[in-house]
């Protein structure tokens, strides 16, 4: 991946907003992912999900971790080893969900940045989200 391009762009991302929207959209677009978040309260409608404080908080947490990955593109497995263990061994999250969230994140970035999110940037971010998803799914292999 083009590290300079990725980190330069990532520095403009509002992690709390983008994280909240990405996780919220994941839960709305792929409703079966909600089963991991039943303790978050009302997820009955799109508005309920996107307005849910726990979804927003966890979305920020997810993107804070993703930011760590952006800083360590050469060692995604190492960066996400503990989170992989938590999500795979303890929470039994289907690794496909990591790929879905990555794709939703790309959609949200395109929405927030419009023309600035060029096809070249999209190509780079698809590589990054695929790498992160693979690192998170590492415990399944």
Swiss-Prot record:
Superkingdom of the organism of origin: Eukaryota
Disulfide bonds: none
GO MF: haptoglobin binding; heme binding; hemoglobin alpha binding; metal ion binding; organic acid binding; oxygen binding; oxygen carrier activity; peroxidase activity
Keywords attached to this entry: Heme, Iron, Metal-binding, Oxygen transport, Transport
Binding site residues for heme b: 58, 87
Tissue-specific expression: Red blood cells.
InterPro entries linked to this entry: Globin, Globin-like_sf, Globin/Proto, Hemoglobin_b, Hemoglobin_oxygen_transport
GO biological process, one term: hydrogen peroxide catabolic process
GO cellular component: blood microparticle; haptoglobin-hemoglobin complex; hemoglobin complex
CDD domains: Hb-beta-like (cd08925)
Domain Globin stretches: 1-141
Family: Belongs to the globin family.
Binding partners and assembly: Heterotetramer of two alpha chains and two beta chains.
Additional comment: This type of beta-C chain is found in these animals when anemia has been experimentally produced.
Function: Involved in oxygen transport from the lung to the various peripheral tissues.
Protein name: Hemoglobin subunit beta-C
Source organism per UniProt: Ammotragus lervia (Barbary sheep)
Higher taxonomy: Eukaryota, Metazoa, Chordata, Craniata, Vertebrata
């Amino acid at each position: 991946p083009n590290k300079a391009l990725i980190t330069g762009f990532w520095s403009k991302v509002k992690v709390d907003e983008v994280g909240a929207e990405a996780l919220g959209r994941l839960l709305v677009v792929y409703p079966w992912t909600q089963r991991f978040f039943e303790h978050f309260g009302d997820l009955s409608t799109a508005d309920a999900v996107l307005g849910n404080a726990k979804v927003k908080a966890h979305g920020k947490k997810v993107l804070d971790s993703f930011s760590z990955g952006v800083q360590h593109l050469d060692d995604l497995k190492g960066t996400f080893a503990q989170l992989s263990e938590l999500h795979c061994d303890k929470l039994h999250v289907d690794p496909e969900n990591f790929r879905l969230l990555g794709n939703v994140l790309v959609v949200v970035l395109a929405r927030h940045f419009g023309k600035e999110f060029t096809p070249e940037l999209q190509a780079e971010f698809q590589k990054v989200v695929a790498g992160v998803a693979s690192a998170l799914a590492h415990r399944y292999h």
